Amino acid sequence: MSIAQQLMDMGFPADKAEAAAGNNRNLDQALDWIEKDGAGVPMETDAPAQAAPGAADSGAPPVAASFKCDDCGKLLANDDAIMFHASKTKHENFSESSEAIKPLTAEEKAAKVLEIREKIKVHQAKKAKLEAEENREKEKKRREDGKAMISHKEAARDREIREAAQDRRREKNEDEIARKRVLEQIRLDKEARKAKASGQPVPEAKPAPSAAPVAPPKDYSTTTLQFRLLDGQTVRQQFEANEPLAMVRAWVETNHANGVPFTLMTPFPRKVFTEDDMGTPLKVLNLVPSANVILNRAA
């Protein structure tokens, strides 16, 4: 935020705030300029220009010495003071007044500057507190996303271990079937040799029935999602079918979003996912055993 904007936030008129912030002054320098020059202070009690002596006797119409707020009775020096007073109090009724405003003394002006400095300190303290709260929220979200990614990696590792165990069991079963087939063939060969040696007819060798291929069960414990990213590229990633959509979003946000806000949707059937869907498992959202997911920039 610029120095001039900070001064305007504290109640200075725009033109005077710009003047105080000129020459690349920082906030303290601008306040020093205000304190010495006085032109930038949004005082409602600045003294108006005094009419020349005898002006009332010249026959000219009287010149207003000040302006008065008809809502509260406060005397105001000029248009800037009227606008400043109206913005603070929401008062709307003003009129000219012949009553002159007593000029501020040097001590009163210095006290006014100190008062404004104190207001600026309060404003800066509030701003610093707000920034600290925002930083805490960002850090909290970063940690939550990190925990979600760790949980996802652990789930992926467990899934790989289960799949490896399934592969080992399948290989063991296949080896056992092959071993039984070899033993059966050896038995048949022995019987054939015995029959031939005894002059008996050799029994017709019947091929051992091959094990019927067993169709692998449909395992929908996992799903493969293909993402079309914001830059048009596509990537694939596997997730647990019972994982919530929030895990998918966390993975995309960490690896491919590059800090750009986004939404998730499926093209067929078309569905745009909202915050209400983040806790729903992928299986319930019909994203199993595979699905296409498109990233769109958030509005």
Swiss-Prot record:
Signal peptide bounds: none
Regions of compositional bias (Low complexity) in chain numbering? 46-61, 201-213
Coiled coil located at which positions?
A: 111-179
Q: Which InterPro entries match?
A: UBA-like_sf, Ubiquitin-like_domsf, UBX_dom, Znf_C2H2_type
**UniProt note on tissues of expression:** Expressed in the germline (at protein level). Expressed in spermatocytes but not in mature sperm (at protein level). Ubiquitously expressed. Predominantly expressed in the spermatheca.
| Any one Gene Ontology molecular-function term assigned to this protein's record | K48-linked polyubiquitin modification-dependent protein binding
Instruction: Give one Pfam hit by family name.
Output: UBX
| Every UBX domain range | 218-295
GO biological process terms, alphabetically, are: cell differentiation; IRE1-mediated unfolded protein response; masculinization of hermaphroditic germ-line; negative regulation of proteasomal ubiquitin-dependent protein catabolic process; negative regulation of protein K48-linked deubiquitination; negative regulation of protein ubiquitination; positive regulation of protein catabolic process; spermatogenesis
Tell me, in one coarse class, where this protein mainly resides: cytoplasm
Q: Which UniProt keywords apply?
A: Coiled coil, Cytoplasm, Differentiation, Spermatogenesis
Q: Report biased composition (Basic and acidic residues) as residue ranges.
A: 128-176
Q: Which GO terms describe its cellular component?
A: cytoplasm; nucleus; perinuclear region of cytoplasm
Q: Where is this region: Disordered?
A: 39-61, 127-176, 191-218
Q: Does the keyword Signal apply?
A: no
Where is this chain's protein located in or outside the cell? Cytoplasm, Perinuclear region
Q: Which function does this protein serve?
A: Ubiquitin-binding protein which acts as an adapter for ATPase cdc-48.1 and/or cdc-48.2, conferring substrate specificity. Together with ubxn-2 and ubxn-3, plays a role in hermaphrodite spermatogenesis probably by promoting the degradation of sex determination terminal factor tra-1.
Can you name this protein? UBX domain-containing protein 1
